[in-house]
Design a protein with these regions (language model features):
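Intrinsically disordered terminal tails
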Residues: 1, 195-196
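Membrane-interface helix-boundary motifs at transmembrane edges
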Residues: 11, 94-101
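Hydrophobic cores of alpha-helical transmembrane segments in multi-pass integral membrane proteins
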Residues: 15-92, 102-188, 192-195
Length: 196
């Protein structure tokens, strides 16, 4: 069925912003995956990085896996958030503007800057703490001397905490945006019922 030419399709600018950021974050994790695979292919004659990481999951290497998994969860969360903004702006016809727009910007920045930085820092901390970064930087020459260093992880606690706080602030701002949009629509619905 073809829509009439004079109809206008409603769109959500906030849903578009969150979907675009999810696509960008997806490109980042794809690049990171290709980078890991390329490094493994280059160093395959000297060490099997994937095998080493899977055998040393108890130590700092788990930060690599957790950061990677959390990054993928973050991408899905950003894309899912777009559905909520679309519902508010298109279905409920609640334009996000004014104070709610400021909250939505904090939400977008908090999720993308705070969330992405937390997960990427966790991945980097795992690479450094597990000793894999040393192998990569030396071209795979010191595979015999590979030893995890848990003490190096202490320097990542404060940056991870700061960016986790930015993420939480963004999520709280997003929750407030959702709540204000929903309650505003409820008031409008109650006014229509009272007028009828």
């Amino acid at each position: 069925m073809v829509a009439p030419s004079n109809s206008s399709f409603l769109s959500s600018k906030w849903a578009s912003r969150f979907l675009q950021s999810a696509i960008i974050q997806g490109a980042v994790i794809t690049f990171l995956t290709v980078l890991f695979i390329s490094i493994q292919l280059l160093l395959s004659s000297s060490i099997n990085i994937v095998q080493f990481l899977s055998l040393s999951f108890e130590g700092p290497a788990k930060w690599i896996f957790l950061g990677y998994i959390f990054y993928m969860i973050l991408i899905v969360s950003i894309a899912t958030t777009a559905v909520f903004y679309n519902h508010f702006e298109v279905n409920m016809q609640r334009i996000i503007r004014g104070f709610r727009s400021v909250l939505a910007w904090v939400h977008l920045i908090g999720m993308n800057v705070g969330g992405a930085t937390v997960t990427l820092t966790m991945i980097y901390a795992g690479l450094v703490g597990s000793g894999i970064m040393g192998i990569i930087m030396s071209g795979g020459n010191n595979a015999v001397e590979l030893k995890p260093n848990t003490q190096v992880l202490e320097q990542f606690i404060i940056p991870i905490s700061i960016f986790a706080a930015i993420l939480v602030i963004g999520l709280i701002a997003g929750g407030l945006t959702f709540l204000l949009s929903f309650l505003g629509n409820m008031k409008r619905f109650e006014n229509k019922v009272q007028q009828a």
